[in-house]
């Protein structure tokens, strides 16, 4: 039977991609249905209890700037907050928070249940309704059919998921959850390229069996950072420390002597694992010269005794896992409460997607999260938001939107996936972005909130706060520009006391702030330049904008030069054999990838600058030289 009411957008899966997709579509006013196999696991942290980190924190801030959920949820659930790379420049600083799993899940579910235009329904999905190469709905395991104008697949590791512990394996979407086998089979019938990937998780330890007295503590930052531009530290729950231990030669001997029982090394697992989150087996074998690896013991929550030992992801048999755990300092009597495991799952080649994350072959079908070959909650959330907003726009007969590489880490992520694809789980790093100085955590709202407002993602409260911040920045910069001190002024002595070289000519507040030894906080304690802004976010922007003004202007010039050709569109139906002068290799790669723009084409391995020049000349001759907005 068909459900009596049609929807604009259906989201299949309630993880980090699915929840952001559902919230985005509903915020934009579209009638949205979120289908999940279990309402109680909405927003579940399947692996590590943490949000953020290098590159990942940037994505969370961008999701927040577009009105998303993740930053707000972690501000309510974070039990330890830190700024990574705090001593480095603002481009690579990143926020990271340990999470209380239960509080995080509660925050996500509360937000979903209070979101207008959003309905949640508990049933596993087994089929899609496809009519004339267009997806128009979904079918649940009890045969109930839902119709919609767009469908977003955010199914994580559930597609034909297979869990491995030692040489034993069984079907599962993650520990304790069933896999999605009928849906996997259905998707394999569609004109989509499919592959297998693998990820893993460490055993969980009973905190009561760990001797923390012999371990080093790691505390969070004080004052505590916040993730959301709308948040403040008073929202954070009680803060707790993490602890550090290490593997040792005994640990490594245990691993090496049991590799024949590892499903990876025995050839049982076919899927490729994440390069930047390797199993402890991989670390020991790949870095054979190292006699120890640092392991972080991270609490899973304020009301839980479970500890997440970050750094020993493994699929070795349980008896070997026990030996590994008990070989480390402080863990000699530790008890495992959940075994570690590896999981293999289907993913679909993201090169078959448009930058909006809609399928090139099936109209109305969007993909987001691990199904696209990524790893990580943050990467999933960012894709979910993009897929959700574009599904909403499609259902409203509007053009899709995707950020440029120069505009957001989300733009880098999507462009990398859609242009280059991936053969291993993709993780975001700041090093993947060409324009890191422009794509900082601190200015994510300045880059994206206005666009989010135009798209219908940003509510009135966030918009008002954003405009107030802009006004504070502009007003303060004008004040510092117009407030000046001369070497002969009475205030000069007070100013000189904070400078490595005394004033030799008249200087404005901005001139002084550009000096390496001067900070905004210090400057605004000086009589001529007091008082400081009470808006800490605006104050941070004033300092960064002034200190890095020259570098930022130079990078903006680079972006504008690059964008002249970046946005030149390539016809989706173009057969590159028509373009004379291209090599057979380039023709084959362009016909295989079908890039949407010259920018995408230029990033395909083997497509040379000379080939790009030939393409531009050909487009001009054909009268097809068009640029996207």
From Swiss-Prot:
Keywords: Cytoplasm, FAD, Flavoprotein, NAD, tRNA processing
Compartments reported by the entry: Cytoplasm
Pfam families with a match to the protein in the record: GIDA, GIDA_C_1st, SAM_GIDA_C
Record-level GO BP terms: tRNA methylation; tRNA wobble uridine modification
Primary site of residence: cytoplasm
SMART domains: GIDA_assoc_3
Domain of life: Bacteria
GO molecular function, one term: flavin adenine dinucleotide binding
Gene Ontology CC: one annotated term: cytosol
Record function comment: NAD-binding protein involved in the addition of a carboxymethylaminomethyl (cmnm) group at the wobble position (U34) of certain tRNAs, forming tRNA-cmnm(5)s(2)U34.
Family stated for the protein in its record: Belongs to the MnmG family.
Name of the protein in question: tRNA uridine 5-carboxymethylaminomethyl modification enzyme MnmG
Source taxonomy: Bacteria, Pseudomonadati, Pseudomonadota, Gammaproteobacteria, Enterobacterales
